[in-house]
Amino acid sequence: MLIDTHAHFYTDRTPRADWQERNASRLRAGERVGITIHVASILGSWGLTSPTYFPSAADLEYANEQMRALQRAHPHRIRGYVAVNPNYTRHAVREIERGVAGGMIGVKLAASRRSDDPLLDPIARAAAEHGLPVLHHIWQHRRRDFPGQEASDAVELCALAHRHPGVRFILAHLGGGGDWLHSLHAVRDVPNVYVDLSGSGVDGGMLEACLAAVGVERLLWGCDLTIDTGWAKLRYLATLLSADELHRVQWKNAAAIFPRNAFPPC
């Protein structure tokens, strides 16, 4: 089994006219490399009618409903994260409840608020209530602010994780750019923070450093927007790990932190 813990899809209310082909191409590429399940989110309108990193409540509702529709259309291949904006706290909690009722298995937070902000506490409590992991967009060692987003770094995510030790948090895209050593140092001794290996970065020594920092038990495989570099990292991990260790990264760790029966038995 191979679980992509960080995937994305599009809808008709996003800037891409080729959104259907993009969605189909992800599934085709996943078949080629052996992905069993794509655990995915849709980030509002991807900037069409509200900012990607500050999506409106209406855009999130539509995106999450379309994510559930994809789940229903591909029940053996797709699972959904509920995407929420913590600035709309009560709405976010309601969306999580709707998502759980519709079979979604995690929470997706992007860059609408720093991860150590108290506004995220009700979301973390809702995740704990429903046994959902939280995938949080992270800029590896933020050096400056970017327009239209409040990007978080690993230190800020760990502050949230310390406040909610019963919630499993996923540090998104270690290979997404920036100082991943800073991130690994921050998460080393925070056992409820897992690291997803997605992102286009494939720096020499990154995977070895990740294994040294958090061990194979807290690594999750993922791709983010494209599959090619995720596949490259998986092939390299196969040269570093035993078969059982590789299976942990491929699917066993994900199966342990997502809700029971979220994935087919293996």
What are these regions (language model features)?
Residues 1-9, 14-38, 209, 213-220, ...:
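Mid-to-C-terminal alpha-helical segments outside catalytic/metal-binding sites
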Residues 10-13, 45-48, 86-90, 114-115, ...:
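Active-site environment of divalent metal-dependent phosphoester hydrolases
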Residues 2-5, 39-41, 81-82, 108, ...:
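Active-site neighborhood of phospho(di)ester-bond hydrolases with catalytic His/Asp-centered motifs
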Residues 104-106, 118-220:
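Catalytic pocket-lining loop regions of alpha/beta-barrel enzymes
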Residues 25-52, 78-83, 104-109:
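Divalent metal-dependent hydrolysis catalytic cores, especially in the metallo-beta-lactamase
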Residues 54-142:
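Active-site gating/metal-coordination segments in enzymes
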Residues 14-19, 46-58, 143-151:
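Short, flexible/disordered intra-domain loops and linkers
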Residues 6, 30, 67, 99, ...:
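Conserved, mostly hydrophobic/aromatic
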